[in-house]
Amino acid sequence: MPQVTMRQMLEAGVHFGHQTRYWNPKMAPYIFGARGKIHIINLEKTVPLFNDAMNFLSSIAQKRGTVLFLGTKRSARESIKEEAERCNMPFMTQRWLGGTLTNFRTVKQSVARLKELEAAETDGTFEKLVKHEVLGLRREREKLDASLGGIKEMNRLPDAIFVIDIGHEDIAIKEAKKLGIPVIAVVDTNYDPALVDYAIPGNDDAIRAVQLYARAAADAVLEGKAAAPNSASVREEEFSAEAGDEGKGRRAPAKKATEKKADAPAAAPEAPAAE
């Protein structure tokens, strides 16, 4: 599990909450006090919850699950995109499109259109069109890529969502809750931690704090992937063990072992299209 110390959190400003007049009383257990009308978050409470959240992310990745990184506010976009790409997970950094989860079937159609336009631009199709048609198709591609480019390889609903600001991403969280998708999120002093499954009490605005969260989440995912069992190796060991029990001392043919593909995780049921 990625180790983030309390000192690192202090240096990143994780302990600075919002103004006291905007606080949510349900965050009281995680607030140390106030300084200059700003709530101070108790990092002694944050650290264990942070570790629990990272362990959960790691367990998802170890089972070859998918974690959707979500951060559409300006201070989170760059870090979320960079770290999601580093751990090869889907992400969204522009405006959340209503129905991205609950109407996933329609979203996949839009993604298919994006891939179609990308292919047309590289296979010579655009060269056969007149200039104004090409400009129109490129604008369409750019618009689709801005909103869906980060999830174009996400072929099924995610197994979990990692969120930076639950107020900014409230629609996404409602959709995830409706579908039973676990939400791991940074929760500042002005929100209700009960809205998510794994709450991390902390500043959700400071760029350094957001970088710390995103980097740790990506590290947790990479650690989980590294710990995932290699199905080919497991099968070879099982084959050899069975052969040993029969007293024949046979070994699994290397070719068969390497050709054995990992079982894909069961696809989450698609929600019916919204009316």
UniProtKB/Swiss-Prot annotation:
GO biological process, one term: translation
Keyword ATP-binding set for record: no
Organism: Xanthomonas campestris pv. campestris (strain B100)
Region feature Disordered, mapped onto this chain: 226-275
Official protein name in the record: Small ribosomal subunit protein uS2
PROSITE patterns according to UniProt: RIBOSOMAL_S2_1, RIBOSOMAL_S2_2
Pfam families on file: Ribosomal_S2 (PF00318)
GO CC, one annotated term: cytosolic small ribosomal subunit
Gene name in the database record: rpsB
Gene Ontology MF terms: structural constituent of ribosome
